[in-house]
Curated annotation (Swiss-Prot):
InterPro entries: Expan_Lol_pI, Expansin, Expansin/allergen_DPBB_dom, Expansin_CBD, Expansin_CBD_sf, RlpA-like_DPBB, RlpA-like_sf. It comes from Oryza sativa subsp. japonica (Rice). It is a peripheral membrane protein. Residues 46-161 form the Expansin-like EG45 domain. Residues 1-22 form the signal peptide. It comes from the Eukaryota. GO terms for cellular component: extracellular region; membrane. Keywords: Cell wall, Cell wall biogenesis/degradation, Disulfide bond, Membrane, Secreted, Signal. SUPFAM superfamilies: Barwin-like endoglucanases, PHL pollen allergen. Its main location: secreted. This is Expansin-A6.
Length: 259
């Protein structure tokens, strides 16, 4: 019979392996990449994930708009991918086999007026990354325009904790979740207000995804300290207790713990 310590280590390795498989870690897949947004990536701001200014949110220029096959109707927002150029290394790819890791921050819509191999790069079922230009130039030459790539899901490395920006008004609370480490994407969000005597006081209430990574609650939360429970795409959950104090205001951002 194996010693208890060895059994514990084996169990931990099994859990880690399952999480890695859930993220698709190590599973290189074929796709294509183009670029947009200009040399400073200013044209990538905003986007279908709702992150707004990608500089101030910490995503910088290492970002990508995903095609329909990858975007998953917005549930992939915040996920991270490692890409390497797989084209003609003399004409398209940079030498040395460099890779770049990007965060999904936008949607690359299909263009059915053009064929998939002639301008409709993001048409289903193509797995396509429209990279911020600086990210593209880390693996390929500008003149290439479009290159075949190999890609895989990877864990997201973030500085600081998960951030919650509370927008909206009384009875309509729209919470933007950013800077999520690990899986990066958010599959569910719940809110709990402090105290008791209301629908959310002292108990968890699920929020519904409005768009991108904006999550909605129609409860009256004013004057209550807010706790959030985040469940990521790999099934892991994180509770950030009383992350917003009772005197919070709409438009403020609060930072909690990290995965």
């Amino acid at each position: 019979m194996a010693p208890p310590l060895l059994l514990l280590l084996a169990s931990l390795l099994l859990v880690a392996a399952r999480r890695a498989l859930g993220l698709g870690l190590g599973q290189w897949q074929p796709g294509h990449a183009t670029f947009y947004g200009g040399g400073d990536a200013s044209g990538t701001m905003g986007g279908a994930c709702g992150y707004g200014n990608l500089y101030s949110q910490g995503y910088g220029t290492s970002t990508a708009a995903l095609s329909t096959a990858l975007f998953n109707r917005g549930l992939s927002c915040g996920s991270c991918y490692e890409l390497r150029c797989a084209g003609d290394h003399r004409r398209s790819c940079l030498p040395g086999g460099a890779t770049v890791t990007v965060t999904a921050t936008n949607f690359c819509p299909p263009n059915y007026a053009l064929p998939s191999d002639g301008g409709g790069w993001c048409n289903p079922p193509r797995r396509h990354f429209d990279l911020a230009e600086p990210a593209f130039l880390r693996i390929a030459r500008h003149a290439a325009g479009i290159v075949p790539v190999s890609f895989r899901r990877v864990a997201c490395a973030r500085k600081g904790g998960v951030r919650f920006t509370v927008n909206g008004h009384a009875y309509f609370n729209l919470v933007l979740v950013t800077n999520v480490g690990g899986a990066g994407d958010v599959r569910s969000l719940a809110v709990k207000g402090s105290g008791s005597g209301s629908r959310v006081g002292g108990r968890w209430q699920p929020m519904s995804r409005n768009w991108g990574q904006n999550w909605q609650s129609n409860a009256y939360l004013d004057g209550k300290a807010l706790s959030f429970r985040v469940t990521a795409g790999d099934g892991r959950s994180l509770t950030c207790a009383d992350v917003a104090p009772a005197g919070w205001q709409f438009g403020q951002t609060f930072e909690g713990r990290q995965f």
